Amino acid sequence: MAKDDVIEIDGKVVEALPNATFRVELDNGHIVLCHIAGKMRMHYIKILPGDKVKVELTPYSLDKGRITFRYK
């Protein structure tokens, strides 16, 4: 996937699900299912419900995404 094809949007983690999957509410009100990006997994960055995160969505599937950053 080319880097310029992704849509980046901020959101808030609503629920933690099994297998490092999270339900995230985006700033526009949509709820998407997200998994953690590989670099975040590699560096053991923990994500809890209530955290503000940056999510990447593809134009092909707007109901699934990848968490790429956790704001402090």
Curated annotation (Swiss-Prot):
It comes from Sulfurovum sp. (strain NBC37-1). It holds the Pfam family eIF-1a. Keywords: Cytoplasm, Initiation factor, Protein biosynthesis, RNA-binding, rRNA-binding. One of the essential components for the initiation of protein synthesis. Stabilizes the binding of IF-2 and IF-3 on the 30S subunit to which N-formylmethionyl-tRNA(fMet) subsequently binds. Helps modulate mRNA selection, yielding the 30S pre-initiation complex (PIC). Upon addition of the 50S ribosomal subunit IF-1, IF-2 and IF-3 are released leaving the mature 70S translation initiation complex. This is Translation initiation factor IF-1. Residues 1-72 form the S1-like domain. Its main location: cytoplasm. It is found in: Cytoplasm. Belongs to the IF-1 family. The gene is infA. Component of the 30S ribosomal translation pre-initiation complex which assembles on the 30S ribosome in the order IF-2 and IF-3, IF-1 and N-formylmethionyl-tRNA(fMet); mRNA recruitment can occur at any time during PIC assembly. One of its GO terms (cellular component) is cytosol. GO terms for molecular function: ribosome binding; rRNA binding; translation initiation factor activity. It comes from the Bacteria. Gene3D superfamilies: Nucleic acid-binding proteins.
